[in-house]
Amino acid sequence: MRIGISPFATTQETALELSRIAVEGGLDTLWLGDGYLANPDFTGWAGAMESLAELAWLAGRYPTARVGIAAAILPLRDPSWLAKQANTLHRMAGGGFVLVVTPGFWAHDLEARGIAFADRAAVFDASLADLRRLLPDETLSPGPSSTGPPPVWLAGAAATMARAAALGLPFLSSRATPDELGPIARRFFDAGGEFLAHRTRLEYGEHDVTGNVVDWHAITGSAGEFVDTLGRYAELGVGDLSIIPGQDDAGSLRTVEILAAEVMPQL
């Protein structure tokens, strides 16, 4: 199971430090989410920046890292321009960019751009077809790299998971403990799904993790408990794990340091 983090922090300097510790400690993928309007659970360097721009910056600072967006709200993005951005970033990251796309979770983001929340699935399906056609298109500038375009994964709820299984695309689930993920993973694989990834919030220590609008389903605990939790995700068939280690300098640093120094050597 491949493991990476979102370098969420209070300051730009700590976002860089988190990335350094992670990459040097074997947490080799740097993930960012996506959003349009201000969200009290994703502020500043903890998820508010434009994701593709920040990922390009991180790819330049840490050229051995894989980078990924989890997940781009596809109905809010022009597929032609996203294909250009994705192929560019894939080249900048040495062939190490993962493009995860979703129909969208926040109604206000979509409605602010004139898209009814109920229409997002239809818009997503049309845009996904366009995106998959455009990414390998050699007439675009830049077209795909010599190793091909970046991989496309899907993220979302049950309907999107079914799309992923039907299309043979990887699916990224999110915000579920191993117990909660178990039945989801079984449904995905029973439907013919081929590759399951997961995004979760994992923080060192014993404390409650609450959000303003996000129900995190966060996992907290010791290094030993982390080893057990990550092992359980792997047993469920998760092939790629994206960890949100916190949303401030102190909490994120503490968690990433423990993951790199004590957890990864045991996996």
Predicted feature residues:
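Active-site-adjacent structural elements that line small-molecule/cofactor binding pockets in enzymes
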Residues: 1-267
